[in-house]
């Protein structure tokens, strides 16, 4: 039987310390993540403080099955101001207020021309929606429906300082060996900013499971933990490691919306 050794060289996961996961949640929540880019890498860096992550990427333009890896996206700031100079939306206030993957823009336009670029939820008037433009050239702002209904006629200025460029999709995994080469794979996606249930709940539970399983003195199965952006990240992981998974995978579980 394989005697497993504890993982060393990492920060201790404070599974017994009050507030550890809530503090880590607070650290991760405001990072401007997307399916590519610096926010994704920053988030992987943070998880890499507690897990021995093996990092990988597939570069922009690569054909991955019937998908193509998109350009990277990076946001500096997005701000929408109203007729009197008042701030209507500001990514520094909430990174949900800009359409994720929005193209750069600096325009002055009337309210009626701005409306097609605004997003809100009429039946949840006090919530800011999360909207993406991953695979198209588009731009927009997200705000509560209450705030949208209060907009007055006049000229508005929309400024989005962003860029798309050749880069890649980043992802990571780590492996805990067991008696068998057969693997249990646990995966979660890491790409949405400022969302709890449909984002950080999965990666944080994955980290907790890694912590617990890494402490087992003996494991029958090997365990693989995967963090990747939704859809394109999973496809890139399969593109890289599909043969290995076909040979060794016994079971898999996607952790999301927990």
Tell where the protein language model's regions lie, with residue ranges.
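N-terminal hydrophobic/helix-forming segments and targeting peptides
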Residues: 1-258
């Amino acid at each position: 039987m394989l005697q497993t050794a504890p993982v060393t060289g990492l920060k201790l996961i404070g599974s017994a310390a009050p507030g550890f996961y809530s503090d880590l949640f607070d650290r991760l929540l405001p990072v401007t993540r997307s399916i590519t880019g610096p926010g994704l890498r920053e988030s992987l860096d943070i998880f890499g403080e507690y897990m021995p992550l093996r990092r990988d990427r597939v570069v922009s333009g690569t054909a991955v099955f019937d998908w193509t890896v998109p350009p990277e996206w990076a946001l500096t700031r997005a701000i929408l101001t109203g007729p009197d100079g008042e701030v209507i939306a500001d990514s520094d206030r909430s990174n949900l207020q800009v359409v994720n993957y929005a193209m750069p823009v600096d325009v002055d336009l009337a309210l009626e021309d701005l409306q097609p670029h605004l997003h809100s939820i009429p039946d949840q008037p006090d919530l800011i929606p999360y909207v993406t433009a991953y695979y198209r050239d588009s731009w927009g702002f997200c705000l509560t429906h209450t705030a949208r209904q209060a907009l007055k006629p006049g000229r508005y200025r929309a400024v989005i300082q962003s860029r798309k460029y050749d880069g890649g999709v980043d992802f990571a995994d780590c492996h805990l060996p067991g008696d068998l080469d057969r693997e249990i794979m646990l995966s979660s996606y890491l790409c949405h900013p400022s969302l709890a249930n449909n984002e950080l709940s999965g990666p944080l539970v994955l980290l907790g499971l890694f912590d617990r399983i890494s402490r087992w003195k003996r494991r029958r199965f090997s365990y693989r933990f995967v963090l990747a952006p939704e859809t394109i990240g999973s496809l890139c992981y399969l593109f890289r490691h599909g043969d290995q998974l076909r040979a060794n995978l016994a079971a898999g579980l996607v952790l999301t919306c927990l």
